[in-house]
Amino acid sequence: MKRLLVLTLVGAALGLAQAPSPEVLQGVGLEETLALAKRWREKGERVVSYVTPEAFFFEFPDGRKARVALGEAFLLAVAPYRQRTHPCQVHYFSSCTGELREETFAVRVLEGNKEVLRTQVRTGKDGFFELWLPRNRRYTLEVRQGDWVAQAPVATFRDSPTCLTELRLSRR
């Protein structure tokens, strides 16, 4: 029994440590695809990964490529900042870096005067947090951290940016 348990645990660990490849992405959901893109960056894997309004794209070290369609979802990567940012339209999980890493923010998303989302988020080691939003809509995004606030219009159309880096926090 102990040997079976050890073999099971070793097998599970090997599955988690599986090298990045298109096969790893087969059959996984959107949340897991996002988690893999972020994990591969944090582990220093040489995988180029980015998201457009239509899909996740991956380019692996061996030259193979993969695409995971977003369907009805739209993924917006957001990097609030105080002093330093970069221009961005398409979010590259493999290289985009925001200023405020591993920090917590209060987020509200409004459609007109109607609040459609209120949540707490934490930026990752890359300085970004991600929001899943319905497609083909216009919103106002509000981000707060203590008495620091930023607000910006965002859209989720097929030509909309997937990377928001111009969300400057100001004291209020």
Predicted regions and their residues:
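A short, solvent-exposed beta-strand micro-motif common in secreted/extracellular proteins
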Residues: 137-146
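N-terminal secretory signal peptides
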Residues: 19-81
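Short Pro-Gly-centered beta-turn/loop motif in secreted/extracellular proteins
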Residues: 130-138
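Sec-dependent N-terminal signal peptides
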Residues: 4-13
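Short acidic/polar inter-strand loop motif in beta-rich domains
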Residues: 146-152
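Mid-length scaffold segments of soluble, non-membrane domains
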Residues: 70-124
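Extracellular beta-sheet/turn segments enriched in Thr/Pro/Gly and aliphatic residues
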Residues: 68-70, 74-82, 158-172
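Glycine-centered loop-to-beta-strand initiation motif
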Residues: 123-131
